[in-house]
Amino acid sequence: MPTNAQLTDEYLALVAERGGDAQGRLAAREHMNNSTAIYHHEVVDSSYVPRLYNRETHERFTHIAETTYSILSKVMHEYLENPRYRHVYDIDPRLVELILLPRGYDALLPFARVDLFLNEDDMSAQFCEFNADGSSGMNENREITASIANSEPFKAFAAAHQVRTCNEELFAGWVDEFLKIYD
């Protein structure tokens, strides 16, 4: 199995074979300039080189995500069910009141984005941020992927590898699940 670095090197070689692919880079930038990937009234910066992960790394991300979700769900369940446990958290009483309101859906944590640093040498991870309030990053990822998906280097790479994006899970899949909650 190629390493993530080897996949990236292969992709960069495809770009180099096309003399840097100025036309593809300009098309990607034009896509971004007309996209919905905007943060603080500015189009987000993006790289023309996608972040490529092999199967091992994808499986590691899956394990980290599922384990983290399980732990967070257990903590949230304990918080909701055990009043003595709540003192561990210094939360404004008004917010506690809102937290304890009935949800109207089963999931304790219907949405989260967990940011981490992954050491690709040993697959260890360090968390740097937890978010459960929304994520413009899902839309940014979708737009950035769309900006390069029709480029010649990307098409050549995809022809040689099984390429899978996470757009369905990150954006459309989330929208579908969100609508099911309130259907």
Task: Locate the predicted segments by residue.
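Preference for protein termini
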Residues: 1-183
